[in-house]
């Protein structure tokens, strides 16, 4: 089975969906007689990443290449990726297309299906629906892409319910939540050089690993820390990541008078992220839905933190109900209620036994339920069934019209 995956959401560009696709397709390609090609765009750092990924079992092709005397990037948005996809369909003759993004990849898959009868499955992380609901014409094209798909992969229950709401048949929705690399994310002693670098010795550390954008809720944690510092003077907030909100968050920390209790770590290489989780006492990302409909589709960071034995706090919006079991692996809070977040942080920072209990349960749950190989098997089986069904349809058509 040849699989051609079309997506703009792929490493080395940072983000949960990029990690989701990388791990899912890395394991999918390990199945016998399954060949996977990722068709994606060039982003900063792609050459080094592709060299390192050359040992993986899938291929990566990047668009924005010269074509005759002009370049694909000079074409209107959407046409370049479509031509790139069409060229690889003609060249490689895949059995199925996977569309990782609604636009332009999902639209490209829909058009190619009409042109070539090639089946496709599409992905939904939830925000594809919440972000387009507010527009006049986008919901129509969105619905055509999902209705035309042979299957739609929902990454969480929130996404599955959103698909049902817009009329996608339940029989065509397959829920495949993210997994965790348990060899990479595991409990280990704190790395002393990082403890010294960020002056964390003897501190109670609250950690967020995320892009610095509004829906992640960094500002809420800052305000909660400001409330707690008098009672818990050793509490420190470690922020790992970069983003457009960095200056605003630094300004807020200064206004709250807590700069000494905040560490802006900036970009941290992926190989050091497990060590960052192991530095903290509590992982907190009180995500919220933005006015434009932007939401947290799942929250892979909650699983990564649990995998290292840490309790987590997340927001109640989006798909976090799949990532956090309330009172078992952590807590979900109403991000509009600062009192609730503050109290949950106080509870965890002052109760060692509770932290250990939730962290251990989180680790056990991740080991039981969130193996990447299991998710890849589900994707493999869905894809194979679609390909077999299409083959049966073709044989039936040939028998019905022998001439």
What are the roles of these predicted feature ranges?
Residues 42, 158, 179:
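Carbohydrate-associated surface elements
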């Amino acid at each position: 089975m040849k699989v051609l995956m079309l997506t703009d959401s792929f490493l080395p560009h940072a983000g949960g969906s990029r990690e989701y696709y990388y791990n899912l397709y890395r394991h999918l390609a390990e199945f016998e007689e399954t060949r996977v090609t990722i068709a994606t765009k060039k982003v900063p750092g792609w050459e080094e990443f592709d060299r390192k990924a050359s040992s993986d079992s899938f291929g990566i092709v990047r668009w924005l290449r010269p074509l005759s005397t002009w370049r694909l990037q000079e074409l209107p948005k959407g046409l370049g990726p479509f031509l790139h996809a069409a060229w690889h369909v003609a060249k490689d003759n895949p059995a199925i297309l996977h569309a990782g993004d609604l636009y332009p990849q999902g639209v490209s898959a829909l058009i190619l299906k009409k042109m070539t009868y090639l089946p496709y499955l599409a992905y939904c992380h939830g925000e594809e629906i919440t972000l387009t609901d507010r527009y006049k014409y986008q919901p129509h094209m969105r619905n055509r892409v999902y209705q035309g798909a042979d299957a739609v992969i929902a990454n969480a229950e929130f996404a599955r319910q959103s698909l049902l709401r817009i009329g996608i048949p339940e029989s065509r929705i397959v829920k495949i939540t993210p997994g965790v690399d348990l060899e990479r994310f595991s409990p280990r002693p704190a790395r002393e050089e990082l403890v010294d670098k960020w002056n964390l010795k003897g501190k109670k550390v609250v950690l967020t690993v995320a892009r610095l954008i509004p829906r992640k809720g960094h500002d809420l944690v800052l305000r909660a820390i400001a409330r707690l510092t008098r009672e818990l003077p050793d509490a420190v907030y470690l922020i790992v990541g970069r983003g457009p909100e960095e200056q605003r968050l630094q300004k807020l920390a200064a206004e709250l008078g807590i700069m000494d209790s905040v560490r802006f770590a900036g970009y941290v290489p992926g190989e050091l992220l497990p060590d960052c989780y192991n530095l903290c006492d509590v992982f907190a990302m009180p995500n919220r839905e933005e006015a434009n409909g932007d939401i947290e589709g799942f929250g892979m960071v909650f699983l990564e933190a649990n995998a290292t034995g840490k309790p987590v706090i997340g927001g109640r919006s989006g798909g976090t109900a799949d990532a956090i079991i309330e009172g078992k692996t952590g807590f979900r809070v109403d991000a509009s209620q600062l009192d609730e977040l503050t109290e949950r942080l106080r509870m965890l920072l002052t109760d060692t036994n509770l932290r250990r209990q939730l962290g251990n349960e989180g680790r056990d749950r991740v080991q039981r339920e969130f193996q990447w190989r299991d998710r890849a098997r589900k994707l493999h089986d869905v894809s194979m069934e679609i390909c077999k069904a299409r083959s049966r349809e073709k044989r039936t058509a040939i028998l019905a019209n022998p001439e």
